[in-house]
């Protein structure tokens, strides 16, 4: 395989499109850590590792992955990347909160809770949301 610097030089010489170059960079970065991906146990860990990958990158990673990592990549592509809380920025504004950078943190924490199974229904999401809001507004 080409070293990354040589790959970049070749891409520049061939005038590779920016989108393709971005996919190559993402694939290179994620492929370097496929062994640790196979050790991910929580959904949030898998999402954090793979959320920057689009479908083409996921396909390339799956093809290059050791056998132990392939089911994890498949699980992310098929299910985990689609898990999001019902709460969104509009929900938070409707609750009277002013948009602040902490909105993102609240939504992130809710999503991670769904991914890890610590929240499994709307009632639990609402309880966690109330807790997160109280932490932000104190």
What are these regions (language model features)?
Residues 1-138:
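C-terminal subdomains that position terminal phosphate/3'-OH groups for nucleotidyl transfer/ligation
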């Amino acid at each position: 395989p080409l070293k990354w610097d040589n790959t970049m030089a070749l891409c520049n010489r061939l005038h590779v499109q920016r989108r393709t170059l971005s996919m190559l960079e993402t694939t290179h970065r994620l492929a370097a850590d496929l062994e640790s991906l196979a050790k991910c146990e929580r959904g949030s860990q898998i999402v954090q590792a793979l959320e920057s990958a689009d479908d083409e990158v996921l396909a390339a990673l799956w093809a290059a992955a050791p056998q132990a990592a392939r089911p994890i990549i498949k699980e992310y592509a098929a299910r985990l990347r689609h898990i999001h809380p019902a709460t969104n920025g509009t929900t938070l504004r409707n609750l009277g909160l002013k948009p602040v950078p902490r909105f993102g943190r609240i939504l992130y924490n809710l999503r991670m809770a769904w991914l890890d199974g610590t929240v499994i229904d709307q009632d639990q999401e609402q309880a966690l949301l109330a807790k997160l809001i109280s932490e932000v507004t104190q």
